[in-house]
């Protein structure tokens, strides 16, 4: 019975670790002061940009973008 219990714990950790890693992703965002025309569209399409949208990578003083965490 001891070996089965250890196996269950190992499986639980294997399942939990990826979920914890996902929890460290950038915060969900809502758009604030975002005009898409002010941000070059290519920035929004690049895979390395944050998932929240164009505002994430446009400095407010330069492009009129900006974002804040939800909640």
From Swiss-Prot:
Keywords recorded for this protein, A-Z: Amidation, Antibiotic, Antimicrobial, Disulfide bond, Signal
Protein's UniProt keywords contain Disulfide bond: yes
Single Gene Ontology BP annotation: killing of cells of another organism
Post-translational modification as stated in the protein's UniProt record: The amidated form is probably the active form.
Keyword Lipid metabolism: no
Residues carrying Arginine amide: 70
Cysteine disulfide partners in this protein: 29-58, 34-54, 39-52, 44-55
Cleavable signal peptide: 1-23
Family: Belongs to the paralithocin family.
Functional description taken from the UniProt entry: Has antibacterial activity, mainly against marine Gram-positive bacteria like C.maltaromaticum (MIC=50 uM), C.mobile (MIC=50 uM), C.divergens (MIC=50 uM) and C.funditum (MIC=25 uM) but also against C.glutamicum (MIC=12.5 uM). Has very little or no activity against Gram-negative bacteria.
Protein name stated in the entry: Paralithocin 2
Organism: Paralithodes camtschaticus (Red king crab)
